[in-house]
C-alpha cells in the first residue's frame, strides 16, 4: 500500500489472473530480448512508456517490477544478467543505497558477468526545491523520453 498527499497516488497492488505476488520475487511485466529495465514503485508506468519508445526504434525491452527491494530477487537477477548485455535500474530513489545500489552490490559479488549496469535515479542529495512529482522527475531525468535516450545510448555503446 502506498499513500501520498495526492488522491490519485493511493493504490494497493493485487495479483491479476495467474500472477503470484510474493515478497522477494520480482514480476516480469514485459518480455523483450535486447535490454532489461528493472524498476519499482510508481515509476513503473514511466519505465513501460520508455520501453515502448525503445520498441519504436527496434529495441525489444524486458521490464522487471521489483515490488520489494529486500529481500532482493537474486534468482531473477542471475537470469537477467546472464541474458542481457545492458541492464538498467530505474528508480525514484538515490542511485546510492536504493534498488540500484543493492543490484550493484549483488553484481560485484558475481563471477565474470560481462554486462553494462546502468543506474538511473536521483542524486545523493536533498532536493532543496519545491515542486510536483512531475517536476522532480524531470529535474532528475526520470521521464520516459530521457530514460529511453540514456538506455539507447548505453545499448549503442555496448554494441560497438
Annotate each predicted stretch with a short phrase.
Residues 9-160:
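Thiamine diphosphate
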